[in-house]
Regions:
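Subset of outer-membrane beta-barrel
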Residues: 20-478
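Bacterial Sec-dependent N-terminal signal peptides
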Residues: 1-23
Length: 478
């Protein structure tokens, strides 16, 4: 089980750095990373993006809000939802439905793009990661109420947790045809770092004050580049070298197309992350649907104040972990475990004003294919290329995580480009007196710098002034 705890700690460290692509940038003029949404998109110039400064970002997508967990108490302090002054009914009103939490890490380590006639090429190295959780509503009732009412039965089925971290090297190619079609492909070589997945199909808990009767059916798998190291105790160095010579590899592809239906109307579509990683060493735990008795333990935390919040939640999570009974299981060691990536589909439609092409309206539909963690979003965007080197975007989105307002600005003259944007301002629009965000934890903030180079090949080239006719030469001609 040391393997599980080490990988879990690694996954949690990734969670604190999590971020996601800036979907507000899909229609943003001059945004260098549009090709990551659709490989058919071509940059207005070539660019170089260096480590650290090329993108600093953080965020999460969730149906939860901080106010669902922290409540004011009679002492004037904030208490968790476990506090005795917080009623069961109030907690269930806020946390009684299925909860989704998705975070994505997309850390560009190095990126490069350049143009060659009608083609555009990109090459980048990045670290990718996903942390996803789907929790049944009864899980919070279990944590809040427990067996305080005497006998209680909880249905914790369809609980799903997953995390994948991998390194990626990608090459992208886009070609323009007939001055109206752009077709693109992006090839990705992947190397797995860590993967942890838990899928509980059935979990029923019957509780009383003395013991819990648990019945569970599900599985958990753990894969990591550290898997061999943690199992080898005699010669760690040789184990490490052997593992590095035989890494967990994978392959993925992005496909995209963009079509100018009319002069002022563009349709685009793409499929991103179509592929998988093959893990060479995995530990798979299977829970049989046989009932067992779990004695649990008592928690003395009062739920008041923010200093002991971590202790309270850790204690409750320890109780939940005990329900899975993984400690008593012998894992099945699998040498080949192929896991698909979470695939994403984008469909966009952009309309420009005939009398002012610098102003456009865009519709973007996004769907994430990821099993129980799948989600869908529709986003309406207004985009303004105020100058050839300065652009703005504002948008409104509706998704499985609720509704949100986003915006971005992009300063992109030749030689230097800086961008700042967010897909949702909502968490920053409402705060408690303790400066706790009250709205849904559904946001991201992206800031970065890169260095454009080469001839401008964007939508707004400089107009060539016609030379004035020489009046004298005209008279001589007459």
């Amino acid at each position: 089980m040391k393997k599980i705890y080490l990988i879990a700690a690694f996954v949690l460290s990734v969670f604190t750095l999590s971020a996601q692509n800036l979907r507000t940038g899909y229609f943003l003029d001059g945004y260098s990373y549009r090709y990551q949404f659709n490989p058919a998109f071509q940059g207005e110039r070539g660019f170089i993006a260096l480590p650290v400064i090329n993108g600093i970002s953080f965020g999460a997508e969730s149906t939860l809000a901080v106010k669902d967990f922290l409540y004011p108490t009679s002492s004037g302090k904030l208490g968790t939802f476990l506090h005795p002054e917080v009623s069961d009914a109030e907690v269930m009103k806020n946390l009684g439905q299925r909860t989704m939490l998705n975070t994505n890490l997309d850390m560009n380590l190095l990126a490069f793009g350049f143009r060659a006639k009608k083609t555009y090429h990109t090459l980048d190295v990045s670290l990718k990661g996903n942390v996803n959780a789907t929790l049944p509503g009864d899980i919070f009732r279990f944590m809040k109420v427990g067996a305080s009412d005497g006998n209680a039965v909880y249905d914790l089925a369809n609980l799903s947790l997953s995390s994948d971290v991998y390194a990626q090297v990608a090459y992208g190619f886009s070609r323009r045809f007939l001055d109206m079609f752009n077709v693109g492909i992006r090839l990705k070589a992947l190397m797995g770092v860590a993967s942890a997945r838990t899928n509980v199909r059935n979990l029923s808990v019957s509780m009383n004050s003395d013991q819990w009767m648990v019945s569970a059916d599900g599985s958990a798998s753990f894969s990591s580049i550290y898997q061999t190291l943690m199992s080898g105790e005699e010669d760690i160095l040789n184990e490490a070298m052997a593992k590095l010579k035989s890494p967990d590899l994978g392959f993925a592809v992005d496909l995209g197309v963009s079509v100018d239906l009319f002069k002022y109307l563009t349709l685009s579509a793409s499929i991103v992350d179509l592929g998988a990683i093959g893990w060479k060493n995995s530990s798979i735990y299977t829970l049989a649907n046989d009932p067992w008795v779990y004695n649990g333990f008592d928690i003395s935390a009062s739920g008041e104040g923010t200093d002991n919040i971590e202790d309270q939640l850790n204690a409750k999570l320890d109780e939940l972990a005990g329900l899975f009974n993984f400690e008593g299981l012998t894992p099945q060691q699998v040498k080949k475990n192929r896991q698909k990536l979470a695939m994403t589909m984008h469909v966009g439609l952009e309309a420009r004003l005939p009398f002012y092409e610098r102003l456009s309206a865009g519709l973007l539909a996004t769907h994430r294919f990821n099993g129980s963690h799948s989600w869908t979003e529709g986003r309406f965007s207004v985009n303004w290329a105020l100058l050839r080197w300065f652009s703005l975007a504002a948008n409104y989105a509706i998704s499985d995580f609720g509704h949100s307002f986003g915006g971005a600005l992009n300063l992109h003259p030749k030689g230097f480009s800086v961008f700042l944007g967010t897909d949702s301002f909502r968490p920053f629009t409402s705060f408690s007196p303790n400066m706790i965000p009250l709205n849904d934890l559904n946001t991201n903030l992206v800031f970065g710098v890169n260095f454009p180079f080469g001839k401008y090949n964007g939508r707004f080239p400089k107009k060539i002034k016609e030379p004035k006719k020489d009046k004298k030469s005209k008279k001589d001609k007459d």
